[in-house]
Structures are given as structure tokens and as C-alpha cells.
């Protein structure tokens, strides 16, 4: 299949620049993957589509305020750092701009000197391996000095950092939010549980590979970046129990979906596991664990658009996307949602 098979026209004004004030009042496009039928709802109506046998699987990762503005110690020149991946306790793979000022041995300072850094090596695709020096707790310093690493298509400043976190976020380590989860409120989750639906949590730390474009013509040649995931025993038991009782495993977001499909065996069973995944799901892939998916609207020609096409069929998805554009749904991270059932 070609990348151009996943292109669609998206007017720029449909790219959501800020989150909804009330998370669960975003719009919801419901797509029946068997018939291609479409319904237009509000996100909190998701409750009507869930049954007591179902299980919702949510990614509890938390976004690090991973964008740091600092200065070169020697010259005072302004620098921008974006933390990508923790290699060791105080060592990170980092994107540094401007790169020419970040040679091995270069030292940098942030804030009033409470955080310092040194380039100790070169990483993949122009990234740098950076060691940080500080007193106290790194996460607390980062929380104080760092900014949210918003996707490149969001031009407006985010007033409240928590609006780019899910209400159930817990495990720090992502460079981007698992955005399908942003639509849930504490109240909606409570109602879902009261209906008898099981909630199961896993972790996948979202990397910036999420926003990297597919640069090859044939999608089979594309290589994904790896991301860290973990699933505990309790979550595995809830999912396996749901399958045994004939219920649906509903992934909240493509990150939960990719983790489930990484861990799942041929029979659709999962187990406690952690590791790194570079799974790439595109049409032709047979889902083992995931029965339904709650997700946002994705970029043209993106790997995530290919993932949803593998679940619902390319024609159904491209038709639904054209309808969404026509009906002026809001797209991408802060946009509206889709439920593929």
C-alpha cells in the first residue's frame, strides 16, 4: 500500500488549537466497523455504547514538561532542549536547538543555575545524549522550569499544563499526551464504572516518533520508533477475564491499542510484561486483543491513520474522515473523538 492512499483534504482551521473547557463535551463520531454506518454524538454519550461485559483499557502515562529553555554556559547563547528518552537516571536522549552549539563537552545552564547539563554523546537522527546536574528531585525541578512539549501543529500557548494530561495520568515519562484519554472526566469514569464496565490501566510512554511523518512511498518500508510500555498482573487478568466472558476489550487511544497488540498472543491473551515496542499496525494486520477503539482524528498520511484503517477498513475510515471534515469536526490532539465499534 502507498502512503498517498491515506491522504485527505484537511482545512487548517479544523486543527484544534486549544482543549475543550469541558473535556467530555467534545463531539464523538461513532463508526460501525462492520457496516461503515456513522452516528454523530457528544463524547459523554460513549456511556450508551458500553455494556457491563466491556473493559476499557487506558494509558496512565503522564507528560513530562520536557521542553527546557536555557543558555550555553560559555557564551550565554539561548538554547532549547527537548527531552526524548531517559537512558539512565540523569542521562537523557535530547533534541537540542541550535544543534551546532551542542557539541560533546558543551555545558548549559537553566533557570538560576538550579539545573545544569553537559552533552556527553551523540544520539540517533541528530539528537544528543545529555547528562543533567542538580540538587534535589529532578521531576520537581523539571516541573518548575519545563514547558509542555506541544505538537508542532498547535501554535497557541497552553494556559494550564493539566489540560494536556489525562485525569488518570500517573506514570511520568511521555513527550506527548495519549490524547484520546483527554476526553474523560472523573465523573464520566465514575458513571462508566457504575454501569459495570471494567477499567484497566497500562503504561506506554509516548515518544516524538508519534509526530514524525512517513517518508517512504510504500508503507511496508516504514520503521517505527520504539516506545517503553508496561502492563501489570491486575490489568492482564481483567483483560483476559473480559475475553473469556465474551466482552469487548476497548482500547482508549492508539497507544493502549499498540501496547495490547504488542503483548497479545495468537489467542488474544495478555500477560504481565514490560519492554520496548516498535509495532507498526496497517491494513492487512489482524487484531488479536482489541475489539473496539476510542481515538482522536489523525493527521493525513500518518501511521495512526493506518492503524485505525486496519481496524475498521480503509474505505470506512476515509469515508468517515471526509464526513468529519464536511461536518467541521475538530482534528488532532485537542480535537474531537471517534469511537470505532
Swiss-Prot record:
Belongs to the QueA family. Its EC number is 2.4.99.17. This is S-adenosylmethionine:tRNA ribosyltransferase-isomerase. Monomer. SUPFAM superfamilies: QueA-like. Transfers and isomerizes the ribose moiety from AdoMet to the 7-aminomethyl group of 7-deazaguanine (preQ1-tRNA) to give epoxyqueuosine (oQ-tRNA). PANTHER family: S-ADENOSYLMETHIONINE:TRNA RIBOSYLTRANSFERASE-ISOMERASE. Coiled coil: none annotated. The gene is queA. It is found in: Cytoplasm. Keywords: Cytoplasm, Queuosine biosynthesis, S-adenosyl-L-methionine, Transferase. It comes from Clostridium botulinum (strain Kyoto / Type A2). GO terms for biological process: queuosine biosynthetic process; tRNA wobble guanine modification. It catalyses: 7-aminomethyl-7-carbaguanosine(34) in tRNA + S-adenosyl-L-methionine = epoxyqueuosine(34) in tRNA + adenine + L-methionine + 2 H(+). One of its GO terms (molecular function) is S-adenosylmethionine:tRNA ribosyltransferase-isomerase activity. GO terms for cellular component: cytoplasm. Pathway: tRNA modification; tRNA-queuosine biosynthesis.
Amino acid at each position: 500500500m502507498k502512503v498517498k492512499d491515506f491522504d485527505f483534504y484537511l482545512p487548517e482551521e479544523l486543527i484544534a488549537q486549544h482543549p475543550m473547557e469541558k473535556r467530555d463535551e467534545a463531539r464523538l463520531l461513532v463508526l460501525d466497523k462492520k457496516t461503515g454506518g456513522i452516528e454523530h454524538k457528544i463524547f459523554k454519550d460513549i456511556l450508551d455504547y458500553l455494556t457491563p461485559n466491556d473493559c476499557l483499557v487506558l494509558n496512565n502515562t503522564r507528560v513530562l514538561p520536557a521542553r527546557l529553555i536555557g543558555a550555553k554556559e560559555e557564551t550565554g547563547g539561548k538554547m532549547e532542549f527537548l527531552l526524548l528518552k531517559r537512558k539512565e537516571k540523569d542521562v537523557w536522549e535530547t533534541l537540542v536547538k541550535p544543534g551546532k552549539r551542542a557539541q560533546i563537552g558543551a555545558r548549559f545552564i537553566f533557570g538560576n543555575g538550579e539545573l545544569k547539563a553537559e552533552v556527553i554523546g551523540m544520539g540517533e537522527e541528530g539528537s544528543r545524549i545529555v547528562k543533567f546536574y542538580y540538587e534535589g528531585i529532578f521531576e520537581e525541578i523539571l516541573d518548575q522550569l519545563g514547558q509542555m512539549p506541544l505538537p508542532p501543529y498547535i501554535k497557541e500557548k497552553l494556559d494550564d499544563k493539566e489540560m494536556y494530561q489525562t485525569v488518570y495520568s500517573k506514570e511520568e515519562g511521555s513527550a506527548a499526551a495519549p490524547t484520546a484519554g483527554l476526553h474523560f472526566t472523573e465523573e464520566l469514569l465514575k458513571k462508566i464504572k457504575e454501569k459495570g464496565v471494567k477499567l484497566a490501566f497500562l503504561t506506554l510512554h509516548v515518544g516524538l516518533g508519534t509526530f514524525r511523518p512517513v517518508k517512504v512511498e510504500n508503507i511496508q518500508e516504514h520503521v517505527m520508533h520504539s516506545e517503553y510500555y508496561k502492563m501489570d498482573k491486575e490489568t492482564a487478568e481483567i483483560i483476559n477475564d473480559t475475553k473469556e466472558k465474551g466482552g469487548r476489550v476497548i482500547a482508549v487511544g492508539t497507544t493502549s491499542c499498540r501496547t495490547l497488540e504488542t503483548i497479545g498472543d495468537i489467542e488474544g491473551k495478555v500477560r504481565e510484561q514490560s519492554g520496548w515496542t516498535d509495532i507498526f499496525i496497517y491494513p492487512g494486520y489482524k487484531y488479536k486483543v482489541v475489539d473496539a477503539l476510542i481515538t482522536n482524528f489523525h493527521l493525513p498520511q500518518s501511521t495512526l491513520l493506518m492503524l485505525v484503517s486496519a481496524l475498521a477498513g480503509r474505505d470506512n475510515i476515509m469515508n468517515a474522515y471526509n464526513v468529519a471534515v464536511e461536518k467541521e469536526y475538530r482534528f488532532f490532539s485537542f480535537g474531537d473523538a471517534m469511537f470505532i465499534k
